[in-house]
Amino acid sequence: MAYRAGFVALIGRTNVGKSTLLNAILKEKVAITSPKPQTTRNTIRGILTTEDYQIIFVDTPGIHKPKSKLSEFMIEVAKRTLKDVDLILYMVEPDTSIGPGDRYILDNLKEVDTPVILVVNKIDLVPAERVEEAIKVFKSEYNFKDVVAISASLGTNVEVLKEKIVSFLPEGPRYYLDDYITDQPEKLIVAEIIREKMLYFLEEEVPHGVYVEVESIKEREDKEIVDIDAYIYCEKESHKGIIIGKNGQMLKKIGQAARQDLEEFYGKQVFLQLWVKVRKGWRDNEKLLRKLGYAIDK
């Protein structure tokens, strides 16, 4: 049996479960997950390598109407991804009608030649009849190569989906070494873990107006300890107060939760220090967005 390797895009509306699926397949926390929309900013590659195949997953930001330079970047990344991969997984919820968000995505899919598998997620939340009806509705709009109904959070049919993905991969050598799980820089992984905790603990408006910049990551020579210094930047003074919280309790809660995940990631004790600063209008600052890795090459 020839070795197979290829790139697979995860695409869909915000919050349909793309990152949850990626993490379930890889058994590692690679993509940031949260119940709030627009939580994935960077194109994150999760890499699954076996003796027979290698799948490089590209987890795109959700497509939505742009409201800032940052969201324009997110949408441009998602649209370009469609043309640069071997297979697209189009993830939807079991809706019995197609809303404007999915209509916009379907229109974009019709502009590319890449094969598409329809992945209907969250089947554990609705009756089977509704799942079947949703599949009929979406199949009437697009000629999908295959359809798989799953529950990413429970792992239902995830292995079935994995087998179907492999069948679409081209024959060829692996792109990454066996022990690679993601090609994200270390500081980006740390920053995303911290930002994920803010998404869980803070009010709806605040987390999407923040970014995390990791100043330093140092391993102590004499002890099994990793020292991490990071800055949380927000757009408003009022947001700074919310992030810090009364007597610093909210920042402490964010730091403790992030530290637990970071200690699991590093396999050793982590000493995490967080600071909060205000940087007004950062989401429309092209120079800063480019520095943070959000810029699109024209």
Curated annotation (Swiss-Prot):
Gene name in the database record: era
Organism: Caldanaerobacter subterraneus subsp. tengcongensis (strain DSM 15242 / JCM 11007 / NBRC 100824 / MB4) (Thermoanaerobacter tengcongensis)
Name this protein carries in UniProt: GTPase Era
Family per record: Belongs to the TRAFAC class TrmE-Era-EngA-EngB-Septin-like GTPase superfamily. Era GTPase family.
A single GO molecular function term of this UniProt record: GTP binding
Region spans: G3: 59-62
Binding site residues for GTP: 12-19, 59-63, 121-124
A single cellular component GO annotation: plasma membrane
Membrane protein topology class: Peripheral membrane protein
Chain positions covered by the region annotation G4: 121-124
Region G5: start-end pairs: 150-152
Span of domain KH type-2: 202-280
Subcellular location: Cytoplasm; Cell membrane
Keyword GTP-binding attached: yes
Known function: An essential GTPase that binds both GDP and GTP, with rapid nucleotide exchange. Plays a role in 16S rRNA processing and 30S ribosomal subunit biogenesis and possibly also in cell cycle regulation and energy metabolism.
Oligomer status and interactors: Monomer.
Domain Era-type G: 4-171
One Pfam assignment: MMR_HSR1
Segments of this protein annotated with the region G2: 38-42
Region described as G1: 12-19
